[in-house]
């Protein structure tokens, strides 16, 4: 029931103020005063009575104790990326992705299409041409083998090291960890996940035909041994149905070689990739997927030119000497046209096949370019090197021509080493050549045009030397050699060599 009051001032009975709602004074109903005097006395007593405070508690939401599990979240939408219930945290920032979430993947790294085996950074970057291109390669950090993902991102080449966890040995680069490299690559590529700083894997580069599997190569007879490994006669299986091809195989020593030495070994293959000429040894491919690393090349069933010249059983004829020098000039000219400097032209690096075709081989020191400057120690073929190389470390097509003159000396002295009898070795010989105190001389009868080529190839100044094209032109004019395009093999056409008379004898140079 509401009490009446002035208009607009309605208040329910027994309504208390805000403070009265929070704090209430208690007294018994039978002590309620009736008279004004009693009421005043009651008020005095009430003032002396202590007030009891009754605080109404605010209801609280029940807390979840540590032993209680939180309510389950709603089931996620079906997605490979949201399948977190199967994932296990490896570290705070890593999540292990199970194999069934990745999907079907070829887990043998050797068969993975984007894996290129052992490869140097420079060789790798030459293959990355478009934005998003990537490949996986093997390298060495200290004595430990590691895998690197190389990516072309915008205008930069980025090399991301694949790391491994300590306990489970899982592979990771940024956030997710996997049981294999192949799963890591497949997951990031399929789901467009950044492999590093926002970079995604767009286009994987497959291996080329010259990147061979070790299982394709069979090693047979050992033919020799070099600085980095051995040379074997072997066979190469090019396809399931084709017969094996007889090849020469250079194998790299598996022990005690640094990553830089392995890269130097493979530099020969890198130079040979684009070469194809009848007077240059044919390149089949490399095996870099696993040890041993191998370079597979054409097998020449003859000897090296050096062995042929030194042979006492069968002397090299005058006609064949000219033929071999012509073949060598054609091979060198082809290399220079491809901007390749051989840097080790010598009879030991010229191979002969059963058809007496000479082929330039051994590209271990070769470099791409027209001219380079390189200062390095080690064992250098001083007796074949040009003065500018010995003095300043300059290599060019002209320095190859200077070495071609040394090859001519070997041919016409039946395999003698240049400066063999001068009594100087090493640094003493180097200083004598630089100081013009000694020069190479052929003390035998030479055809006039051969003597002229020799003299012009051994000029001290690079600009005074003859070029490979000029040498070939002289051979064609004097002897009549030419190239038959249908077979790509050089043949001797004109029938007789110019007669050599004593009056035509012209020493190319005189030892001082």
Swiss-Prot record:
It comes from Caenorhabditis elegans. PANTHER family: TYROSINE-PROTEIN KINASE. Changing residue 229 to R: In hc79; self-sterility in hermaphrodites but normal male fertility. One of its GO terms (biological process) is cell differentiation. Residues 15-41 have a biased composition (Basic and acidic residues). It is found in: Cell membrane; Cytoplasm. One of its GO terms (cellular component) is plasma membrane. Residues 1-85 are annotated as: Disordered. Expression is restricted to male germline. This is Spermatocyte protein spe-8. Residues 68-78 have a biased composition (Pro residues). It comes from the Eukaryota. The active site is at 344 (proton acceptor). It is a peripheral membrane protein. Belongs to the protein kinase superfamily. Tyr protein kinase family. Fes/fps subfamily. Its main location: membrane. Keywords: ATP-binding, Cell membrane, Cytoplasm, Differentiation, Kinase, Membrane, Nucleotide-binding, SH2 domain, Spermatogenesis, Transferase, Tyrosine-protein kinase.
């Amino acid at each position: 029931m509401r009490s009446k009051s002035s208009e607009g001032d309605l208040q329910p009975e027994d309504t208390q103020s805000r403070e009265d709602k929070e704090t209430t004074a208690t007294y018994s109903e039978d002590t309620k005063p009736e008279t004004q005097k009693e009421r005043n006395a009651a008020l005095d007593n009430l003032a002396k009575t202590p007030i009891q405070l009754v605080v109404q508690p605010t209801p609280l939401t029940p807390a979840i104790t540590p032993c209680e599990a939180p309510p389950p979240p709603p089931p996620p939408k079906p997605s490979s990326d949201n399948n977190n219930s199967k994932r296990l945290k490896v570290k705070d920032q890593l999540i292990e992705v199970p194999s069934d979430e990745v999907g079907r993947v070829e887990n043998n790294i050797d068969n993975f299409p984007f894996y290129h085996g052992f490869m140097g950074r420079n060789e790798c970057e030459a293959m990355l041409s478009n934005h998003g291109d990537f490949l996986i390669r093997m390298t060495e950090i200290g004595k430990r083998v590691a895998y690197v993902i190389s990516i072309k991102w915008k205008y930069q080449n980025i090399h991301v090291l694949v790391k491994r966890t300590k306990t489970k040995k899982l592979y990771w680069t940024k956030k997710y960890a996997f049981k294999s490299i192949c799963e890591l690559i497949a997951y990031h590529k399929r789901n467009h996940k950044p492999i590093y700083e926002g970079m995604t894997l767009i286009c994987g580069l497959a291996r080329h035909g010259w990147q061979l599997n070790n299982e394709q190569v069979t090693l047979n007879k050992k033919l020799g041994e070099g600085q980095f490994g051995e040379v074997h006669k072997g066979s190469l299986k090019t396809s399931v149905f084709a017969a094996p091809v007889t090849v020469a195989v250079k194998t790299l020593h598996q022990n005690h070689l640094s990553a830089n030495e392995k890269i130097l070994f493979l530099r020969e293959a890198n130079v040979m990739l684009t070469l194809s000429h009848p007077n240059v040894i044919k390149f089949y491919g490399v095996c870099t997927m696993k040890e041993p690393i191998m370079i597979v090349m054409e097998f020449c069933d003859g000897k090296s030119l050096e062995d042929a010249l030194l042979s006492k059983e069968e002397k090299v004829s005058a006609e064949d000497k000219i033929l071999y020098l012509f073949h060598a000039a054609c091979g060198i000219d082809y290399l220079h046209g491809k901007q390749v400097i051989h840097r080790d032209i010598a009879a030991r690096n010229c191979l002969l096949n059963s058809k007496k075709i000479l082929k330039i081989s051994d590209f271990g020191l070769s470099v791409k370019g027209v001219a380079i400057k390189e200062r390095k120690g080690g064992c250098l073929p001083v007796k074949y090197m040009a003065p500018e190389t010995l003095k300043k470390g300059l290599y060019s097509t002209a320095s190859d021509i200077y070495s071609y003159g040394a090859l001519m000396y070997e041919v016409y002295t039946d395999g003698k080493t240049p400066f063999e009898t001068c009594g100087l070795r090493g640094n003493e010989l180097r200083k004598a050549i630089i100081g013009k105190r000694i020069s190479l001389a052929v003390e035998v009868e030479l055809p006039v045009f051969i003597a002229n080529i020799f003299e012009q190839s051994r000029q001290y100044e690079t600009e005074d030397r003859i070029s490979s094209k000029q040498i070939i032109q002289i051979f064609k004019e004097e002897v009549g050699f030419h190239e038959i395009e249908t077979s790509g093999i050089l043949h001797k056409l004109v029938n007789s060599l110019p007669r050599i008379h004593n009056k035509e004898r012209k020493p190319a140079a005189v030892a001082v």
